């Protein structure tokens, strides 16, 4: 074997490394081997001496091995195939209660298939025993629980599920746990304050903000066949353990979270880090936000002085100079309201436009964030504005300025809000009582009633069917004898069909008064006889005193004689009506108008009852 070396070319000022190649000739095939050779040269002085150091390293290649950048594609394919296989096996193992509706199967396929939610469970709440009935049974028929990978996954799953329900079942889902942008920004501010406070206290707050933003629980009412869907992150699902709540009594032991004590919660971490240090607690109290008002008493007197003079520029300067916490702003608005109340009580003419703009200008987001204190205050202020100028601040303005505003800000309307609107409708004066003006008022009421759909009172009854609300609604349908809405009779029939024997005295009196106002005596007697109890049902509890007063105040001799001669008053004795002194006086006044004073009938009704 002959060996030939290709020597490098020697030149001056060369500072690079030269790579010599060695060629080996054999009788067989020719192979090329490379040796990495590093050569360094020095040209200082006259005598050029070079120092050469060689470091050789052989690189071996395996022709059959696939490079790493080609193996990525294969690994991704294997991973995707594994996910598909797991998905198919999960669908096979998906257990849905028997005799369940087809909608549950479609929703389950969407959650586990397209949305990729894990740990899918369905609880059938229809077959609960009577001994274990709770609030959970009243929610729906099926409870679905599944796990998402993150909070974004929860939110995206809710959006896709809502879109699916609208397309397939024409239903819009109701969700709890979905934070909008305003609530999310508020939560971030609270977390920032908590983080700053923790730094001042020497505590670590790295886990608090991160953990709170990484956990979520969405409870969705599909409004389809009583199906509820709970989408949770894994940690939140372990903490809440909803399976134990929804499971039957004989299966609750299967879902008991035995290792729940090992899962550290945020409050637990903070409690451990504080080490129950009393000094840290005192420092926290010293540095926490003060909740008392720091307004100057002289400022209140000056504000009242400017408001009584209706100098709104001076009042604005005082309010802006002393602006502070949410509690302080609420107290300032209360002071403005009390001043307006005094002026309206004195029947002074006030500039309603300026008073309204003053209240709106200082109703900031900090103030609205206290709904329990702000909205009752705004309602009372709106009633005062309507009392001061019903033409400017009418029922239409109240609908937009209060009801729609409160509803759009996510607050729940209450019974007092609807009553305030109906009272404003009745107080609003028109130039003439015409049918078209009555129709305009009715349109405002219809728009308001649409906002109160589904709202319940404290007695689990609808707000619309409240006794006072019904009375005001009937009064708003009648202006005088000639002007009335055609829907009055339909409303009365609907009230009778809805309540039946459970009609209250207030509802009956309101119906009688409105029928007497339009002088429809036939309908009035028809209503009165329709609610007459039979003799075997016991004592008659109808409002006899109000009925006789309505008839007597009509002044119609024909109607009065018809009531007396047809024997309507005899039912007082037949049904054992409790004759009070007020009822005795009403009977005497009615018989006196009919010309039967001191008659045998009066003695039979009044004196005979007193003797018993």
Curated annotation (Swiss-Prot):
Its main location: mitochondrion. Residues 1-14 form a transit peptide. It is found in: Mitochondrion inner membrane. It comes from the Eukaryota. Disulfide bonds: none annotated. One of its GO terms (cellular component) is mitochondrial inner membrane. GO terms for biological process: mitochondrial gene expression; mRNA stabilization. InterPro entries: Atp25, ATP25_mRNA_stabil_dom, NT_sf. It holds the Pfam family RsfS. Keywords: Membrane, Mitochondrion, Mitochondrion inner membrane, Transit peptide. This is ATPase synthesis protein 25, mitochondrial.
């Amino acid at each position: 074997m002959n060996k030939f070396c290709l020597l490098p070319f020697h030149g001056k000022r060369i500072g690079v490394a030269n790579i010599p190649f060695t060629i080996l000739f054999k009788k067989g095939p020719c192979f090329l081997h490379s040796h990495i050779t590093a050569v360094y040269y020095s040209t200082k002085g006259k005598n050029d001496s070079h120092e050469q150091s060689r470091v050789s390293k052989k690189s071996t290649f395996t022709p059959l091995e696939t490079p790493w950048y080609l193996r990525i594609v294969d690994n991704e394919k294997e991973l995707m195939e594994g996910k598909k296989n797991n998905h198919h096996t999960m669908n096979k193992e998906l257990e849905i209660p028997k005799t369940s509706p087809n909608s549950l199967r479609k929703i389950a396929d969407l959650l586990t298939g397209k949305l990729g939610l894990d740990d899918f469970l369905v609880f059938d709440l229809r077959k609960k025993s009577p001994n274990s009935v709770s609030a959970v049974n009243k929610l729906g028929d099926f409870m679905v629980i599944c796990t998402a990978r993150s909070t974004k996954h929860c939110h995206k799953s809710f959006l896709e599920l809502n879109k699916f329900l609208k397309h397939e079942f024409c239903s819009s889902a109701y969700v709890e746990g979905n934070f909008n942008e305003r609530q999310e920004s508020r939560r971030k501010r609270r977390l920032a304050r908590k983080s700053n406070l923790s730094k001042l206290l020497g505590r670590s707050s790295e886990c608090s903000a991160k953990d709170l933003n990484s956990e979520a629980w969405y409870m969705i009412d599909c409004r389809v066949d009583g199906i509820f869907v709970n989408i949770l992150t894994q940690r939140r699902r372990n903490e809440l353990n909803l399976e134990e709540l929804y499971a039957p009594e004989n299966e609750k032991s299967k879902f008991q979270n035995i290792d729940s004590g090992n899962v550290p919660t945020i409050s637990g971490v903070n409690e451990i880090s504080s080490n129950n240090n009393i000094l840290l607690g005192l420092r926290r109290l010293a540095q926490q936000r003060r909740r008392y008002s720091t307004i100057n008493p002289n400022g209140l007197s000056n504000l009242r002085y400017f408001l009584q003079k209706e100098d709104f520029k001076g009042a604005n300067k005082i309010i802006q100079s002393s602006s502070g916490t949410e509690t302080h702003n609420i107290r300032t608005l209360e002071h403005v309201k009390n001043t307006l109340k005094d002026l309206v009580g004195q029947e002074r003419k006030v500039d309603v436009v300026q008073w309204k703009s003053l209240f709106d200008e200082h109703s900031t987001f900090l103030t609205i964030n206290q709904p329990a204190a702000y909205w009752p205050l705004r309602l009372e202020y709106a009633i005062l504005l309507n009392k001061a100028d019903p033409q400017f601040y009418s029922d239409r303005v109240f609908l937009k300025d209060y009801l729609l505003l409160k509803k759009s800000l996510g607050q729940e309307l209450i019974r007092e809000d609807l009553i305030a609107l109906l009272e404003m409708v009745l107080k609003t004066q028109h130039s003439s009582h015409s049918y078209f003006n009555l129709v305009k008022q009715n349109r405002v009421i219809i728009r308001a009633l649409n906002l109160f759909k589904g709202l319940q009172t404290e007695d689990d009854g609808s707000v619309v069917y409240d006794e006072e609300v019904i009375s005001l609604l009937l009064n708003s349908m009648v202006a005088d004898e000639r002007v009335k809405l055609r829907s009055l009779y339909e409303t009365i029939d609907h009230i009778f069909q809805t309540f039946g024997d459970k009609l209250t005295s207030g509802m009956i009196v309101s119906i009688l008064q409105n029928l007497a106002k339009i002088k429809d005596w036939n309908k009035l007697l028809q209503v009165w006889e329709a609610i007459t109890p039979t003799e075997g049902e016991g004592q008659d509890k109808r409002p006899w005193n109000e009925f006789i007063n309505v008839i007597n105040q009509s002044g119609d001799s024909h109607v009065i004689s018809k009531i007396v001669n047809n024997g309507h008053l005899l039912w007082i004795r037949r049904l054992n009506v409790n004759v009070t002194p007020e009822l005795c006086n009403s009977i005497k006044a009615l018989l006196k108008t009919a010309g039967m004073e001191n008659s045998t009938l009066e003695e039979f009704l009044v004196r005979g009852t007193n003797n018993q």
